[in-house]
Amino acid sequence: MPNTHKITPQEALLRTIEHREIFHDEMLHIMRGIMTGEWSPVMMAALITGLRVKKETIGEITAAAQVMREFSTKVNVADTSHLVDIVGTGGDGSHTFNISTCAMFVAAAAGARVSKHGGRSVSSKSGSADVMESLGVNINLSPEAIAQCIEQVGVGFMFAPNHHPAMKNVAPVRKELGIKTIFNLLGPLTNPAGAPNILMGVFHPDLVGIQVRALQRLGAEHAVVVYGKDGMDEVSLGATTLVGELKHGEITEYEIHPEDFGMVMASNRALKVETPEQSKTMLQGVLDNAAGAPKDIVILNAGVALYAANVVPTMSAGIDKARVAIESGAARAKLAQLVSMSQQLKGAAK
Protein backbone atom coordinates (compact mmCIF):
# COMPACT_ATOMS: atom_id res chain seq x y z
CA MET A 1 0.00 0.00 0.00
CA PRO A 2 1.39 3.46 -0.84
CA ASN A 3 2.46 5.75 1.96
CA THR A 4 -0.83 7.59 2.41
CA HIS A 5 -0.36 8.87 5.92
CA LYS A 6 0.14 12.51 4.84
CA ILE A 7 -3.53 13.39 4.53
CA THR A 8 -4.78 16.98 4.49
CA PRO A 9 -7.62 18.12 6.75
CA GLN A 10 -9.79 18.62 3.64
CA GLU A 11 -9.07 15.08 2.38
CA ALA A 12 -9.86 13.64 5.81
CA LEU A 13 -13.14 15.56 5.95
CA LEU A 14 -14.11 14.38 2.47
CA ARG A 15 -13.43 10.80 3.55
CA THR A 16 -15.94 11.12 6.42
CA ILE A 17 -18.55 12.76 4.14
CA GLU A 18 -18.23 9.80 1.75
CA HIS A 19 -18.51 7.38 4.69
CA ARG A 20 -15.07 5.93 3.96
CA GLU A 21 -12.59 4.86 6.60
CA ILE A 22 -9.52 6.90 7.48
CA PHE A 23 -6.58 4.45 7.56
CA HIS A 24 -4.42 3.86 10.63
CA ASP A 25 -1.35 5.84 9.51
CA GLU A 26 -3.56 8.65 8.24
CA MET A 27 -5.37 8.83 11.57
CA LEU A 28 -2.02 8.98 13.39
CA HIS A 29 -1.05 11.93 11.18
CA ILE A 30 -4.41 13.68 11.72
CA MET A 31 -4.34 13.27 15.49
CA ARG A 32 -0.76 14.52 15.75
CA GLY A 33 -1.84 17.60 13.77
CA ILE A 34 -4.75 18.18 16.15
CA MET A 35 -2.60 17.64 19.25
CA THR A 36 0.08 20.07 18.09
CA GLY A 37 -2.46 22.76 17.17
CA GLU A 38 -1.83 22.58 13.40
CA TRP A 39 -5.53 22.15 12.66
CA SER A 40 -7.86 25.14 12.76
CA PRO A 41 -10.86 24.93 15.14
CA VAL A 42 -13.21 24.91 12.11
CA MET A 43 -11.53 21.86 10.51
CA MET A 44 -11.29 20.11 13.88
CA ALA A 45 -15.01 20.61 14.49
CA ALA A 46 -15.88 19.49 10.96
CA LEU A 47 -13.77 16.34 11.18
CA ILE A 48 -14.92 15.15 14.60
CA THR A 49 -18.54 15.80 13.60
CA GLY A 50 -17.97 13.95 10.32
CA LEU A 51 -16.46 10.98 12.16
CA ARG A 52 -19.44 10.88 14.51
CA VAL A 53 -21.95 10.91 11.63
CA LYS A 54 -19.96 8.26 9.71
CA LYS A 55 -19.44 6.30 12.96
CA GLU A 56 -15.87 5.90 14.14
CA THR A 57 -14.25 2.56 13.31
CA ILE A 58 -12.14 0.42 15.63
CA GLY A 59 -9.06 1.32 13.57
CA GLU A 60 -9.70 5.06 13.75
CA ILE A 61 -10.32 4.94 17.50
CA THR A 62 -7.22 2.81 18.11
CA ALA A 63 -4.93 5.11 16.11
CA ALA A 64 -6.31 8.23 17.79
CA ALA A 65 -5.86 6.65 21.24
CA GLN A 66 -2.24 5.75 20.39
CA VAL A 67 -1.50 9.41 19.64
CA MET A 68 -3.26 10.62 22.78
CA ARG A 69 -1.14 8.18 24.79
CA GLU A 70 1.98 9.43 22.97
CA PHE A 71 1.25 13.03 24.00
CA SER A 72 0.14 12.24 27.56
CA THR A 73 1.96 12.92 30.83
CA LYS A 74 2.50 9.42 32.25
CA VAL A 75 2.25 8.10 35.80
CA ASN A 76 4.90 5.40 36.24
CA VAL A 77 3.61 2.67 38.54
CA ALA A 78 6.33 0.11 39.28
CA ASP A 79 4.03 -2.91 39.64
CA THR A 80 0.95 -2.99 37.41
CA SER A 81 -0.37 -6.35 38.61
CA HIS A 82 -3.99 -5.94 39.78
CA LEU A 83 -3.89 -2.34 38.51
CA VAL A 84 -7.29 -1.37 37.10
CA ASP A 85 -9.14 1.70 35.85
CA ILE A 86 -12.89 2.01 36.48
CA VAL A 87 -14.17 4.50 33.96
CA GLY A 88 -17.14 5.46 31.82
CA THR A 89 -17.38 7.27 28.52
CA GLY A 90 -19.98 9.48 30.20
CA GLY A 91 -22.66 11.02 28.07
CA ASP A 92 -25.24 8.44 29.11
CA GLY A 93 -27.55 11.23 30.30
CA SER A 94 -28.59 9.25 33.38
CA HIS A 95 -27.47 11.93 35.91
CA THR A 96 -26.61 9.36 38.56
CA PHE A 97 -24.18 9.86 41.42
CA ASN A 98 -20.51 8.98 40.81
CA ILE A 99 -20.81 5.21 40.90
CA SER A 100 -17.38 4.38 39.43
CA THR A 101 -15.66 6.89 41.76
CA CYS A 102 -17.29 5.23 44.77
CA ALA A 103 -16.52 1.75 43.40
CA MET A 104 -12.80 2.57 43.20
CA PHE A 105 -12.51 2.90 47.00
CA VAL A 106 -14.38 -0.38 47.44
CA ALA A 107 -12.24 -2.21 44.87
CA ALA A 108 -9.02 -0.81 46.40
CA ALA A 109 -10.14 -1.91 49.88
CA ALA A 110 -10.75 -5.41 48.49
CA GLY A 111 -7.29 -5.87 46.97
CA ALA A 112 -7.22 -4.10 43.60
CA ARG A 113 -4.99 -1.12 42.86
CA VAL A 114 -6.98 1.56 41.11
CA SER A 115 -5.59 4.26 38.82
CA LYS A 116 -8.71 6.33 38.18
CA HIS A 117 -8.59 8.69 35.23
CA GLY A 118 -11.32 11.32 35.19
CA GLY A 119 -12.33 14.89 34.63
CA ARG A 120 -14.91 17.48 35.51
CA SER A 121 -18.52 17.19 34.48
CA VAL A 122 -19.16 17.44 30.74
CA SER A 123 -22.66 16.01 30.43
CA SER A 124 -23.35 14.61 33.91
CA LYS A 125 -24.40 16.57 36.99
CA SER A 126 -21.14 15.68 38.71
CA GLY A 127 -17.82 14.61 37.17
CA SER A 128 -15.40 12.36 39.05
CA ALA A 129 -12.99 15.27 39.58
CA ASP A 130 -15.79 17.43 41.02
CA VAL A 131 -16.75 14.84 43.61
CA MET A 132 -13.15 13.87 44.45
CA GLU A 133 -12.39 17.50 45.20
CA SER A 134 -15.50 17.86 47.36
CA LEU A 135 -14.40 14.78 49.34
CA GLY A 136 -11.10 16.52 50.14
CA VAL A 137 -8.82 14.72 47.67
CA ASN A 138 -6.10 16.88 46.12
CA ILE A 139 -6.59 16.25 42.39
CA ASN A 140 -3.57 18.28 41.24
CA LEU A 141 -0.70 16.06 42.31
CA SER A 142 2.44 15.46 40.27
CA PRO A 143 2.71 12.15 38.39
CA GLU A 144 5.27 10.96 40.98
CA ALA A 145 2.92 11.75 43.87
CA ILE A 146 0.02 9.95 42.15
CA ALA A 147 2.23 6.87 41.66
CA GLN A 148 3.04 7.05 45.38
CA CYS A 149 -0.70 7.12 46.23
CA ILE A 150 -1.32 4.07 44.03
CA GLU A 151 1.63 2.17 45.48
CA GLN A 152 0.99 3.03 49.14
CA VAL A 153 -2.79 3.54 49.40
CA GLY A 154 -3.85 1.36 46.47
CA VAL A 155 -5.70 4.15 44.73
CA GLY A 156 -4.75 7.28 42.80
CA PHE A 157 -6.72 9.88 40.86
CA MET A 158 -5.40 11.35 37.62
CA PHE A 159 -7.15 14.59 36.66
CA ALA A 160 -7.36 14.28 32.87
CA PRO A 161 -6.42 17.88 31.89
CA ASN A 162 -3.15 17.55 33.85
CA HIS A 163 -2.20 14.44 31.88
CA HIS A 164 -3.41 15.45 28.42
CA PRO A 165 -2.12 19.03 28.01
CA ALA A 166 -2.34 18.76 24.20
CA MET A 167 -6.11 18.36 24.54
CA LYS A 168 -6.32 22.09 25.29
CA ASN A 169 -6.53 22.63 21.52
CA VAL A 170 -9.65 20.46 21.32
CA ALA A 171 -11.41 21.49 24.55
CA PRO A 172 -13.09 24.70 23.29
CA VAL A 173 -14.23 22.94 20.10
CA ARG A 174 -15.77 20.05 22.05
CA LYS A 175 -17.47 22.43 24.45
CA GLU A 176 -19.01 24.54 21.70
CA LEU A 177 -20.15 21.52 19.66
CA GLY A 178 -21.84 20.06 22.74
CA ILE A 179 -22.19 16.61 21.14
CA LYS A 180 -20.52 13.29 21.86
CA THR A 181 -17.43 12.88 19.69
CA ILE A 182 -14.52 10.47 19.29
CA PHE A 183 -12.92 12.16 22.31
CA ASN A 184 -15.60 10.68 24.61
CA LEU A 185 -14.31 7.29 23.49
CA LEU A 186 -10.62 8.16 23.79
CA GLY A 187 -10.46 9.31 27.43
CA PRO A 188 -11.16 5.82 28.80
CA LEU A 189 -8.58 4.31 26.40
CA THR A 190 -5.74 6.58 27.53
CA ASN A 191 -5.10 5.82 31.21
CA PRO A 192 -1.87 7.72 32.05
CA ALA A 193 -0.74 4.96 34.44
CA GLY A 194 -1.08 2.40 31.64
CA ALA A 195 -3.47 0.23 33.68
CA PRO A 196 -3.52 -3.10 31.83
CA ASN A 197 -6.96 -3.95 33.25
CA ILE A 198 -10.15 -1.95 32.94
CA LEU A 199 -13.86 -1.85 33.69
CA MET A 200 -15.27 0.55 31.11
CA GLY A 201 -18.85 1.72 30.78
CA VAL A 202 -20.09 2.96 27.39
CA PHE A 203 -23.10 5.07 26.36
CA HIS A 204 -24.30 3.00 23.37
CA PRO A 205 -24.70 -0.78 22.87
CA ASP A 206 -22.64 -0.76 19.64
CA LEU A 207 -19.66 0.61 21.58
CA VAL A 208 -19.33 -2.54 23.70
CA GLY A 209 -17.86 -4.51 20.79
CA ILE A 210 -15.98 -1.51 19.38
CA GLN A 211 -14.23 -0.43 22.59
CA VAL A 212 -13.28 -3.95 23.69
CA ARG A 213 -11.64 -4.50 20.28
CA ALA A 214 -9.85 -1.15 20.48
CA LEU A 215 -8.54 -2.20 23.91
CA GLN A 216 -7.38 -5.51 22.42
CA ARG A 217 -5.41 -3.68 19.71
CA LEU A 218 -3.97 -1.30 22.31
CA GLY A 219 -2.58 -4.24 24.31
CA ALA A 220 -4.94 -4.39 27.31
CA GLU A 221 -4.75 -7.57 29.39
CA HIS A 222 -8.17 -7.96 31.01
CA ALA A 223 -10.95 -5.60 29.93
CA VAL A 224 -14.64 -5.68 30.76
CA VAL A 225 -16.70 -3.21 28.70
CA VAL A 226 -20.31 -2.74 29.79
CA TYR A 227 -23.56 -1.10 28.70
CA GLY A 228 -26.71 -1.25 30.83
CA LYS A 229 -29.79 -1.75 28.66
CA ASP A 230 -31.50 1.03 30.65
CA GLY A 231 -28.92 3.36 29.07
CA MET A 232 -26.36 3.41 31.88
CA ASP A 233 -22.62 3.41 31.23
CA GLU A 234 -22.15 1.13 34.27
CA VAL A 235 -23.09 -2.40 35.27
CA SER A 236 -26.81 -1.75 35.78
CA LEU A 237 -29.03 -2.65 38.71
CA GLY A 238 -32.19 -1.91 36.73
CA ALA A 239 -31.65 -3.91 33.55
CA THR A 240 -29.57 -6.50 31.75
CA THR A 241 -25.99 -5.37 31.07
CA LEU A 242 -24.23 -6.13 27.79
CA VAL A 243 -20.61 -7.20 28.34
CA GLY A 244 -17.62 -7.38 26.02
CA GLU A 245 -14.72 -9.10 27.77
CA LEU A 246 -11.10 -9.36 26.68
CA LYS A 247 -9.15 -12.03 28.56
CA HIS A 248 -6.05 -13.98 27.49
CA GLY A 249 -6.26 -12.20 24.12
CA GLU A 250 -9.74 -13.55 23.40
CA ILE A 251 -12.97 -11.55 23.24
CA THR A 252 -16.31 -12.88 24.46
CA GLU A 253 -19.61 -11.02 24.42
CA TYR A 254 -22.46 -11.91 26.76
CA GLU A 255 -25.12 -10.49 29.08
CA ILE A 256 -25.34 -10.34 32.86
CA HIS A 257 -28.30 -9.56 35.09
CA PRO A 258 -28.37 -8.27 38.70
CA GLU A 259 -30.37 -11.33 39.73
CA ASP A 260 -27.51 -13.58 38.51
CA PHE A 261 -25.66 -12.31 41.59
CA GLY A 262 -28.57 -12.41 44.02
CA MET A 263 -29.14 -8.65 43.70
CA VAL A 264 -32.61 -7.10 43.89
CA MET A 265 -33.33 -5.09 40.75
CA ALA A 266 -33.91 -1.37 41.24
CA SER A 267 -34.60 1.49 38.86
CA ASN A 268 -31.82 4.04 38.47
CA ARG A 269 -34.24 6.73 39.69
CA ALA A 270 -32.92 6.04 43.20
CA LEU A 271 -29.40 6.91 41.98
CA LYS A 272 -30.11 10.33 40.44
CA VAL A 273 -28.52 13.53 41.70
CA GLU A 274 -28.73 17.19 40.73
CA THR A 275 -25.45 18.55 42.13
CA PRO A 276 -21.91 17.39 43.03
CA GLU A 277 -22.88 17.96 46.68
CA GLN A 278 -25.74 15.44 46.40
CA SER A 279 -23.40 13.01 44.66
CA LYS A 280 -20.90 13.36 47.50
CA THR A 281 -23.63 12.73 50.11
CA MET A 282 -24.83 9.60 48.30
CA LEU A 283 -21.26 8.32 47.87
CA GLN A 284 -20.52 8.85 51.57
CA GLY A 285 -23.76 7.07 52.45
CA VAL A 286 -22.61 4.01 50.50
CA LEU A 287 -19.21 3.99 52.21
CA ASP A 288 -21.03 4.35 55.56
CA ASN A 289 -22.93 1.15 54.67
CA ALA A 290 -26.36 2.74 54.17
CA ALA A 291 -28.61 0.05 52.66
CA GLY A 292 -30.32 0.64 49.32
CA ALA A 293 -29.85 0.83 45.56
CA PRO A 294 -26.75 3.11 45.67
CA LYS A 295 -24.88 0.58 47.83
CA ASP A 296 -26.04 -2.33 45.66
CA ILE A 297 -24.93 -0.78 42.37
CA VAL A 298 -21.52 0.12 43.84
CA ILE A 299 -21.08 -3.47 45.07
CA LEU A 300 -22.01 -4.73 41.59
CA ASN A 301 -19.54 -2.43 39.80
CA ALA A 302 -16.71 -2.83 42.33
CA GLY A 303 -17.19 -6.60 42.14
CA VAL A 304 -16.84 -6.61 38.36
CA ALA A 305 -13.80 -4.30 38.68
CA LEU A 306 -12.17 -6.79 41.07
CA TYR A 307 -12.75 -9.48 38.45
CA ALA A 308 -11.25 -7.22 35.74
CA ALA A 309 -8.24 -6.59 38.03
CA ASN A 310 -7.71 -10.37 38.38
CA VAL A 311 -8.10 -10.17 42.16
CA VAL A 312 -10.88 -12.80 41.99
CA PRO A 313 -11.63 -15.60 39.50
CA THR A 314 -15.32 -14.72 38.97
CA MET A 315 -17.62 -11.70 39.09
CA SER A 316 -19.63 -13.38 41.88
CA ALA A 317 -16.51 -13.70 44.05
CA GLY A 318 -15.75 -10.03 43.36
CA ILE A 319 -19.24 -9.00 44.45
CA ASP A 320 -18.86 -10.93 47.73
CA LYS A 321 -15.50 -9.24 48.37
CA ALA A 322 -16.90 -5.80 47.52
CA ARG A 323 -19.76 -6.24 49.99
CA VAL A 324 -17.32 -7.14 52.78
CA ALA A 325 -15.13 -4.11 51.91
CA ILE A 326 -18.09 -1.77 52.48
CA GLU A 327 -19.62 -3.53 55.49
CA SER A 328 -16.29 -3.83 57.33
CA GLY A 329 -15.58 -0.10 56.92
CA ALA A 330 -12.44 -0.84 54.84
CA ALA A 331 -13.72 1.13 51.82
CA ARG A 332 -14.50 4.17 53.99
CA ALA A 333 -10.97 3.94 55.47
CA LYS A 334 -9.50 3.81 51.95
CA LEU A 335 -11.11 7.17 51.11
CA ALA A 336 -9.72 8.67 54.34
CA GLN A 337 -6.24 7.35 53.48
CA LEU A 338 -6.32 8.90 50.00
CA VAL A 339 -7.54 12.26 51.33
CA SER A 340 -4.79 12.27 53.95
CA MET A 341 -1.98 11.20 51.63
CA SER A 342 -3.00 13.48 48.75
CA GLN A 343 -3.00 16.45 51.13
CA GLN A 344 0.39 15.46 52.61
CA LEU A 345 1.82 15.31 49.09
CA LYS A 346 0.48 18.76 48.23
CA GLY A 347 4.01 20.07 48.05
CA ALA A 348 4.49 17.73 45.11
CA ALA A 349 1.58 19.30 43.24
CA LYS A 350 2.01 20.69 39.75
From Swiss-Prot:
Pathway: Amino-acid biosynthesis; L-tryptophan biosynthesis; L-tryptophan from chorismate: step 2/5. Binds 2 magnesium ions per monomer. SUPFAM superfamilies: Nucleoside phosphorylase/phosphoribosyltransferase catalytic domain, Nucleoside phosphorylase/phosphoribosyltransferase N-terminal domain. Anthranilate 2 binds at residue 174. Homodimer. Anthranilate 1 binds at residue 88. Belongs to the anthranilate phosphoribosyltransferase family. It catalyses: N-(5-phospho-beta-D-ribosyl)anthranilate + diphosphate = 5-phospho-alpha-D-ribose 1-diphosphate + anthranilate. Catalyzes the transfer of the phosphoribosyl group of 5-phosphorylribose-1-pyrophosphate (PRPP) to anthranilate to yield N-(5'-phosphoribosyl)-anthranilate (PRA). Its cofactor is Mg(2+). Mg(2+) 2 binds at residues 233-234. PANTHER family: ANTHRANILATE PHOSPHORIBOSYLTRANSFERASE. It comes from the Bacteria. This is Anthranilate phosphoribosyltransferase. GO terms for biological process: L-tryptophan biosynthetic process. Disulfide bonds: none annotated. InterPro entries: Anthranilate_Pribosyl_Tfrase, Glycosyl_Trfase_fam3, Glycosyl_Trfase_fam3_N_dom, Glycosyl_Trfase_fam3_N_dom_sf, Nuc_phospho_transferase. One of its GO terms (molecular function) is magnesium ion binding. One of its GO terms (cellular component) is cytosol. Keywords: Amino-acid biosynthesis, Aromatic amino acid biosynthesis, Glycosyltransferase, Magnesium, Metal-binding, Transferase, Tryptophan biosynthesis. Its EC number is 2.4.2.18. It comes from Albidiferax ferrireducens (strain ATCC BAA-621 / DSM 15236 / T118) (Rhodoferax ferrireducens).
